[in-house]
Amino acid sequence: GRFAGFPSAGYAVLAIEIHGLEPSRENIGAVHWTEPDSSILFFREVQDGVLNDIHELGKENPYHYIHRRSLLAVMRAMDYLHARKDIDKDRIALFGGSQGGGLSLIAAAIDKRARAVIATVPGFCDQTAWLYGRCGGADRLKGGDREQIIEAMSYYDAALAAQLIDVPVYIGVGFIDATCHPTKVYAAFNNLAGPRTIENFINIAHGSPPGWRERSIEWLDKQFMMGR
């Protein structure tokens, strides 16, 4: 699974699915099923229906944007962890990739209970890059008011939020990533206010190389001074 290795390393994992779907069904459209059951058909229908163009929903208003709900979900997850007696509140980290990586950065800027962040090929970085001659972001303008979208997306830009993050951050960036472009990820990394480390995935697109999870755990151990 996505978090294999963390429990055996001594970390409790709370995985949230921000859209209310099972994590195992995230990429249901990319899976070929010979005999899809009713559950699989449901998730496929949702992906092609209500969750189609999910990142565009409400994009003209920061209070109506779909990922306001996502960030609230992260903060409610933090509330839950802080309500448990078996969790060390001083060693809570946010971990995510792509959409989850960008949201982890934004959430850490808002919720100071996060003590470290690991973001793999994070999204939501440098949302208006195209305004300054950098790649990415221009497609966000399709089907909406230009100025309203630019203003609303500034509330959900991980590169802008990064300047509010003063806890340690570990970022992985794919150098041939056409989804979360490396220039955008570096815009976030360069704005981080606290200790920061970045690993360049030279020949990797939108993903991570073998051993990335193990290195992430090692990095987290160092931040939290976890002895093995």
Task: List the model feature ranges, each with a label.
Residues 3-7, 12-72, 129-136:
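Cap/lid segment of the alpha/beta-hydrolase catalytic domain
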Residues 86-98:
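Alpha/beta-hydrolase fold nucleophile elbow
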Residues 101-148, 200, 208-211:
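Hydrolase active-site cap/lid region
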Residues 146-161:
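Active-site nucleophile elbow and catalytic-triad environment of alpha/beta-hydrolase enzymes
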Residues 164-165, 171-173:
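Short beta-strand/loop motif that positions the catalytic acidic residue
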Residues 167, 181-189:
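Short alpha-helix in the alpha/beta-hydrolase fold that links the catalytic acid
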Residues 175-180, 206-207:
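Acidic catalytic loop of the alpha/beta-hydrolase fold
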Residues 186-228:
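C-terminal catalytic histidine-bearing segment of alpha/beta-hydrolase fold enzymes
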